[in-house]
Amino acid sequence: MAPTIQTQAQREDGHRPNSHRTLPERSGVVCRVKYCNSLPDIPFDPKFITYPFDQNRFVQYKATSLEKQHKHDLLTEPDLGVTIDLINPDTYRIDPNVLLDPADEKLLEEEIQAPTSSKRSQQHAKVVPWMRKTEYISTEFNRYGISNEKPEVKIGVSVKQQFTEEEIYKDRDSQITAIEKTFEDAQKSISQHYSKPRVTPVEVMPVFPDFKMWINPCAQVIFDSDPAPKDTSGAAALEMMSQAMIRGMMDEEGNQFVAYFLPVEETLKKRKRDQEEEMDYAPDDVYDYKIAREYNWNVKNKASKGYEENYFFIFREGDGVYYNELETRVRLSKRRAKAGVQSGTNALLVVKHRDMNEKELEAQEARKAQLENHEPEEEEEEEMEAEEKEAGGSDEEHEKGSSSEKEGSEDERSGSESDREEGDRDEASDKSGSGEDESSEDEARAARDKEEIFGSDADSEDDADSDDEDRGQAHRGSDNDSDSGSDGGGQRSRSQSRSRSRSASPFPSGSEHSAQEDGSEAAASDSSEADSDSD
């Protein structure tokens, strides 16, 4: 331990009698304090103790019932600061000669672009293709930018440009002209690219609907990775994937998934044999497929929201290009295997082909009718209805004329009968006045009664002639009706054939006929499609 050295001053301080006496602390109170005892020292060190009471009970403010019941007066102006004068109209008239405040004048001034003569601003707008712009780091690029157009002026400009660029067909004639122009443009030869003048076509082929395969609905299946098995590659993998099948399945928990099946070796041999013998399938053979992968699926079709039409093209050498519709888009993603759940890796798909039933054939005919468009157009339907109405109106007028003639003949006949009755009465009165015998008078009365009840012979002949004329007119009217009906049917058949020929694609009739024949052959060949489990 190091020695302690004590100085002389320290020794003297130690021997002083008042060395241990502490001086009283000076009070901070201005007035004289009677009792000036100082507080004792803290007997122990401070400790943190949890305060058990609510700390807000001394500072929280609660309004009393007197304050709550008091209603404060809201002192406002009677007009609430809005001076309305309904009598004097000059109250709100603005004086055009009033002097504006200098601050308001600056706001109303037009922006005058100062001439930028600095070299930096002139070189600023240049775009260097190999240099990347860094707008997200600094705003230097926009600092010297000059906007020649004000935002107030550009309101509605994009809408106006859109209307000027797009041709709007407001009337029926312009629509017909535009439709006919599309047929004319399709017949023009293509000499160069629409946007690249140096690009010229090597081969020009017509584009038609695929009449052969349109009857079969097609779907686009998108895999998240290559579905080919890992142990095969090259041509063998492509051959297996070209004959693969996907089927919906359900596991033990009731979850649905899509299974991807690949053909076994025996099935590949059978398919190769069928291809060499140029047949679709052997009626008695059974084709086996083993499960390879399991997927989750996401389907979009025409009934889905946000569906976009999608088409694919088929190039046939020496024939042309044909397009078909993709009705469904299926996205497949790999399914994760769950712990404790047995996977269906040992599943086997057994396929046996059969002929198509009536329901499937009707569905194919309905799809084929989409291209042929048997239904007449609306305009032709209106023309047919107008012609039928005209034919019906002429028949009605003819019937009305015959009925009016008949009524006229009946009126003439009733008039002649009334004249005869009056003449007979006059004769009878003359005879009675002349004093003839009672026998002759009785005979005349009997004859008159007979004429009134049965009519005379002349009247019966007139009635027979008029009835014959009416029957002839009725027969002629029915003949006219049948003729008009046959004419209407001929017009209907002609309009249907005209609409059918017009709705077809713009190619010659011979090609159309051949396409339809090919479509029928495809329907005949496709009638031997696979089972519903092997679509």
Curated annotation (Swiss-Prot):
Residues 375-388, 458-470 have a biased composition (Acidic residues). One of its GO terms (biological process) is mRNA 3'-end processing. Residues 1-23, 361-535 are annotated as: Disordered. GO terms for cellular component: Cdc73/Paf1 complex; cytoplasm; fibrillar center; membrane. Pfam families: Paf1. It is found in: Nucleus. The keyword Phosphoprotein applies. PANTHER family: RNA POLYMERASE II-ASSOCIATED FACTOR 1 HOMOLOG. This is RNA polymerase II-associated factor 1 homolog. It comes from Rattus norvegicus.
